[in-house]
Swiss-Prot record:
Keywords: Cleavage on pair of basic residues, Disulfide bond, Secreted, Signal, Vasoactive, Vasoconstrictor. GO terms for molecular function: endothelin B receptor binding; hormone activity. Pfam families: Endothelin. Its main location: secreted. Residues 22-79, 174-198 are annotated as: Disordered. This is Endothelin-3. It comes from the Eukaryota. One of its GO terms (biological process) is regulation of vasoconstriction. Residues 1-16 form the signal peptide. Disulfide bonds join C89-C103, C91-C99. Expressed in which included heart, lung, liver, kidney, spleen, stomach, pancreas, duodenum, colon, uterus, ovary and testis.
Length: 198
């Protein structure tokens, strides 16, 4: 067991020796490294500029990266933690799995024998039941075949707007194609379809 302790001690010392404290703007004379000329420093201090660069953080971001942070991490401007992936839009129902996969990029799906459970939709604003509507919107008196399935976070995100409006009509058509007997059953009774014999 003693060699294991020595190994742990050696790794601890090695990792601690590689850390160099980053001087803060108000810490003029408080840094741990004395201000000696470069010739008087020891051999271990040669790596200091590299370590200081690593501790100070990455170089300034490009405009594309700043735009991505603005799009996906609104907390960045508020000083909060920035997550690499965030939601693109908010689905109106959990049952629309395609929408949940599209909108909530950081979703984790847990498979259970009974059902697939969504986990991680903490900021979901809809109800668990699917929306029922006749297709009429208050602003348009005629029936609409394009109903919204989600609400985009950014109003300028044309791909998201296209997905949230167009794809719902496609999924409705595919649903009737997968279950044609539910749609045709009432129609066959009215058209003189199969009737029970007396």
């Amino acid at each position: 067991m003693e060699p294991g302790l020595w190994l742990l001690f050696g790794l601890t010392v090695t990792s601690a020796a590689g850390l160099v404290p980053c001087p803060q703007p108000g810490d003029a004379g408080k840094s741990g490294v004395p201000g000696t000329p470069p010739t008087a420093r020891s051999e271990g201090d040669i790596q200091e500029p590299v370590a200081m660069t690593a501790v100070q953080g990455p170089s300034p971001r490009s405009p594309e990266q700043e735009q991505e942070l603005g799009r996906f991490g609104e907390q960045a401007s508020k000083g909060g933690p920035v997550h690499g992936r965030a939601r693109r839009c908010t689905c109106f129902t959990y049952k629309d799995k395609e929408c949940v996969y599209y909108c909530h990029l950081d979703i984790i799906w847990i498979n259970t024998p009974e059902q697939t459970v969504p986990y991680g939709l903490s900021n979901y604003r809809g109800s668990f039941r699917g929306r029922r509507s006749t297709g009429l919107f208050p602003q348009s008196p005629q029936p609409s075949k394009w109903t919204q399935r989600c609400a985009c976070v950014q109003s300028q995100d044309s791909a998201c707007l296209h997905f949230c409006t167009r794809t719902l009509a496609v999924s409705r058509n595919s649903r009737t194609a997968t279950n044609p007997d539910k749609e045709e059953e009432p129609a066959s009774r009215g058209n003189g379809g199969l009737r029970p014999t007396r």
